[in-house]
């Protein structure tokens, strides 16, 4: 295949450049000032666009996506949302999960995403995990992963609460990439963390835990996980998502925990959209923000990513599948700089997913996002929908806008 030349794009901090990408290797081959690279049969004019690393979505729930109206959900806190989802999930089919997840992935792709880590529930009926096929959501997403190969990388984490060991083994044998857990919903959080690490180690897969999804400063999932990882010497990759309670403890305690997390090599995913929506409903005065201690984690050297979490389901009726919205919220609610916030949904997200660096730099993976803007602050502030998305150097999505004034 012929290489693709992207002409006249603006790179953050570097000015206007021409970027040559190899569609064979999927890497950026050359970056040069305008006019220095020879013309070829495949060129795109990106004048007026800012060229960025393509975002990755480190935390999605594609099996739940687009069910807010279907489930008849009402606003409420986390446990209210869990109850609403379980009631709906008891009758959901594999085909329905597949179709909704496909629509959600199309939204993510159009917004710039080229890699997604999605959690998928082991589906229960009212009697627990024994009725129907608890793996039907996983089967739907495995089919979707096969269908999307070459356009988007899909990692699947099996999410459970006190599910039988044999069901977890079966899910991983089917092809799930990681093992998830919600220890704060378990009858025995410490035992749940230990079991998750044990089974993941047996299958040589990573883990991604929903940790401390509460404003209770006494919650301790993250510390439990860090200490268990250090004691076990777990090496397959560990992620802790949410970690909300870390944001409401005293700064010295947050710093101590962050150091333990860094020592254990755990990546943390903050999820501002859903946590701002679900958390703090019982505190009508001086309501906490429901975010983890992002600055303390960064200062300790922890890899921090940011995700969108829910896409219009019982856990958040307004999720837009747009990492640039997530980054914008990190500036507003997390007090990160625009550059830090953008990194959380690009480089930080890819690092948590275990993917190599991407972006408009020689030798990097040619997963790229071109946005009609001039600066990073404009990208996050205006959230312009005019975007071109490249996966492995290949154009996979283009959104154009017609705006008329009368």
Residue ranges and their predicted role:
Residues 1-52:
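Histidine-rich, glycine-flanked metal-binding segment
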Residues 9, 26, 48, 59, ...:
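Divalent metal-coordination and catalytic microenvironments
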Residues 49-71, 214-215:
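Di-metal (Zn2+ and/or Mg2+/Mn2+) metal-binding site signature of metallo-dependent hydrolases
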Residues 65-97, 170, 175-176, 203, ...:
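Active-site gating loops and adjacent loop-to-helix segments of metal-dependent hydrolytic enzymes
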Residues 68-119, 125, 131-147, 169:
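Alpha-helical scaffold segments that flank or form the walls of functional sites
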Residues 136-147, 162-267, 284-304, 358:
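Histidine/acidic residue-rich metal-binding segments in metalloenzymes
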Residues 227-238, 274, 278, 288-373:
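His/Asp/Glu-enriched, well-ordered alpha-helical/loop segment
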Residues 347, 362-406:
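C-terminal cap of metal-dependent C-N hydrolases
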């Amino acid at each position: 295949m012929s290489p693709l030349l992207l002409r006249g794009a603006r790179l953050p901090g570097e000015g206007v450049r021409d970027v040559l990408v190899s569609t064979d290797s999927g890497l950026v081959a050359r970056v040069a000032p305008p006019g220095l690279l020879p013309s070829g049969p495949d060129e795109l004019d990106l004048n007026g666009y800012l060229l960025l690393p393509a975002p990755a979505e480190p935390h999605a729930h594609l099996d739940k996506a687009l069910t807010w109206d279907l489930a008849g959900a009402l606003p409420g806190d986390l446990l209210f949302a869990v109850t609403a989802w379980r009631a709906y999930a008891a009758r959901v089919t594999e085909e329905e999960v597949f179709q909704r997840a496909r629509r959600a992935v199309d939204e993510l792709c159009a917004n710039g995403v080229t890699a997604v880590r999605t959690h998928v529930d082991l589906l229960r009926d009212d009697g627990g995990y024994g009725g129907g096929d608890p793996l039907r959501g996983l089967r739907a997403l495995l089919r979707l992963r096969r269908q999307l190969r070459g356009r988007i990388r899909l990692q699947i984490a099996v999410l459970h609460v006190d599910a039988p060991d044999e069901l977890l083994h079966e899910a991983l044998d089917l092809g799930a990439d990681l093992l998830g857990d919600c220890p704060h919903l378990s009858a025995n959080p410490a035992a749940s963390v230990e079991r998750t690490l044990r089974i993941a180690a047996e299958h040589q897969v990573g883990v991604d835990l929903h940790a401390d999804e509460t404003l209770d400063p006494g919650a301790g999932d993250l510390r439990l996980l860090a200490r268990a990882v250090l004691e076990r010497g777990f090496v397959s990759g560990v992620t802790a998502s949410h970690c909300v309670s870390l944001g409401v403890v005293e700064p010295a305690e947050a710093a101590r925990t962050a150091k333990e997390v860094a020592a254990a090599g755990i990546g943390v995913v903050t999820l501002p959209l859903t946590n701002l929506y679900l958390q703090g409903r019982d505190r009508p005065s001086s309501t906490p923000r429901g975010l983890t201690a992002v600055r303390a984690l960064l200062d300790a050297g922890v890899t921090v990513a940011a995700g969108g979490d829910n896409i219009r389901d019982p856990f958040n009726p307004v999720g837009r599948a747009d990492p640039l919205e997530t980054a914008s919220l990190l500036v507003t609610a997390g007090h990160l700089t625009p550059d830090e916030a953008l990194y959380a949904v690009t480089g930080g997200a890819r690092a948590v997913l275990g993917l190599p660096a991407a972006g408009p730099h020689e030798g990097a993976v040619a997963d790229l996002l071109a946005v009609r803007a001039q600066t990073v602050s404009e990208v996050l502030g205006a959230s312009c929908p005019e975007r071109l998305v490249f996966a492995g150097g290949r154009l996979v999505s283009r959104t154009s806008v017609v705006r008329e004034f009368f």
